[in-house]
Amino acid sequence: MSQQFAPRDAAEAARAAFASVEGKPFPDDIFTAPQLTWAVIGCGVIANQMASTLELAGRKLAGIYNRTHEKAVAFAEKYGVARVYDTLEELCADPAIDAVYITTPHNTHITYLRAVLSAGKHVLCEKAITLNSEELNEARAIADEHGVQLIDATTILHMPLYRELIRRAEKDEFGNMSIAQVSFGSYKDFDPENRFYNPRLAGGAMLDIGVYALTMARMFMLSQPEDVVSIANACNTGVDVTSGIVMRNPDMQMAVISLTLHSKQPKRAVLSFENCYIEVMDYPRADRA
């Protein structure tokens, strides 16, 4: 099947990119959407995208914290951010901030999650949201204790294309899905000190790109996989660089996933149903299938 689900304009793209704290899309008029006051942790590419997207909606970030204060000041000047925090504690103590977007590398996430959620603020957190299930369960428990929302920012979870495909799958338009085949490959020059290959920075294919592939497959499976088999190659720093993963759930649906940081591979997903197959190219950023 080939059908396009492209945002009609910039405002629609902004609506699609940001969910309300209830986990639902903003209403059609983004200017009357719930007005949370946002701060951001980090000032890299993703933080810049956040600030730019909010500007499309006629809004601004209210605060920023970054470990390198000078970079935070420059970011604030660029986007008109009112507050630059000297410390994480200062951000957490600010009653004017409702929600925080954590955009830093994933090895830092749990530290920020503990602090921000404990301060009673909603959190949108970049992928990988945590390094393992123990950290995620801890963060969820803190969010529940303080009555706030913790939202995974993995793009696939918030894209209009997949909401539409899931809606149609739930109406049984496609029939039962038997298998999902998902690949993601990207060649990264080896540097034992960079975030892709350094174990101290939680490097490796699984945490960097595997999040997309696993999320893509899991979204269309009816139940949690119980059988998981994987084979991985590691580089000399010990992190995984190439892997093959096969999963099966109690509904006898399977997923076959291939990941690599050592070669080019299409970001391609094929979902095989009884009545059709759905192919999605560049699935982490797709607007058509």
What are these regions (language model features)?
Residues 50, 79-141:
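Beta-loop-alpha module in the N-terminal Rossmann-like domain of NAD(P)-dependent dehydrogenases
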Residues 156-228, 236:
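Predominantly a Rossmann-like dinucleotide-binding segment in NAD(P)-dependent oxidoreductases
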Residues 85, 125, 150-152, 280:
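Hydrophobic residues in well-ordered beta-strands that form the structural core
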Residues 2, 6-22, 215-286:
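Contiguous beta-strand/loop segments that form the cofactor/metal-binding neighborhood of enzyme cores
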Residues 2-79:
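N-terminal Rossmann-like dinucleotide-binding module
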Residues 137-155, 176-180:
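Rossmann-fold dehydrogenase core element
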